[in-house]
Amino acid sequence: MDNFEQVLNALQQGEVIAYPTEGVFGVGCDPDNPDAIQKLLDLKQRPVEKGLILIAASYEQLLPYIDESQLTPEQLATVHATWPGPYTWIMPASDKVSNWVSGQFDSIAVRVTDHPLVQKMCNAFGKPLTSTSANLSGLPPCMTTEEVEQQLGDKLVAILRGETSGRDKPSEIRDAKTSQILRQG
């Protein structure tokens, strides 16, 4: 059953949603809503200092959140060559980004997804979503809708039904300034 509109409505109302990504299920919310982010951090038992990933349908959706002026054309070309896809890049954060999203850093983790359902959700919402793996602290990330329902069902308003893209691990994380791999994908 397609529950896209129900999940979009929950997102617009400031709720935390779960959704399939390239490798695992993610949980996320409106990156510009501190109350929604607090719900997400509480659900994950995640400290605000760690920061969150933003996942978007297009690079244009990320532009308000990053400071491109701190990156060279070559650095940007390296980033763009990997998107859309399962690559998360650490980029300089713009002044718009609250520390609810960036945590203790002056940078922000961003990804342009190639997952069709997440692209559709970001396009319908009109901006990126925060993204972190769907799991309780200490447990492995959820890979299916059923696993999300078992682990987090009583804590979530809406789960976007769908399949992951088949990767068996979270996205690779790299630093846009150095290309250093921070998390193997």
From Swiss-Prot:
GO annotation, biological process: regulation of translational fidelity; tRNA threonylcarbamoyladenosine modification
EC number(s) recorded for this UniProt protein: 2.7.7.87
Compartmental location: Cytoplasm
Keywords, comma-separated and alphabetical: ATP-binding, Cytoplasm, Nucleotide-binding, Nucleotidyltransferase, Transferase, tRNA processing
Family from the record: Belongs to the SUA5 family. TsaC subfamily.
Catalytic activity reported: L-threonine + hydrogencarbonate + ATP = L-threonylcarbamoyladenylate + diphosphate + H2O
InterPro entries reported in the protein's UniProt record: DHBP_synth_RibB-like_a/b_dom, Sua5-like_dom, TC-AMP_synthase, TC-AMP_synthase_SUA5
Disordered as annotated region, ranges: 163-185
Domain YrdC-like intervals: 1-185
UniProt xrefs under Gene3D superfamilies: DHBP synthase
Comp. bias (Basic and acidic residues): 164-177
Regions that span the bilayer: none
Protein name in UniProt: Threonylcarbamoyl-AMP synthase
Cellular component, GO annotation: cytoplasm
Function according to Swiss-Prot or TrEMBL: Required for the formation of a threonylcarbamoyl group on adenosine at position 37 (t(6)A37) in tRNAs that read codons beginning with adenine. Catalyzes the conversion of L-threonine, HCO(3)(-)/CO(2) and ATP to give threonylcarbamoyl-AMP (TC-AMP) as the acyladenylate intermediate, with the release of diphosphate.
SUPFAM superfamilies: YrdC/RibB
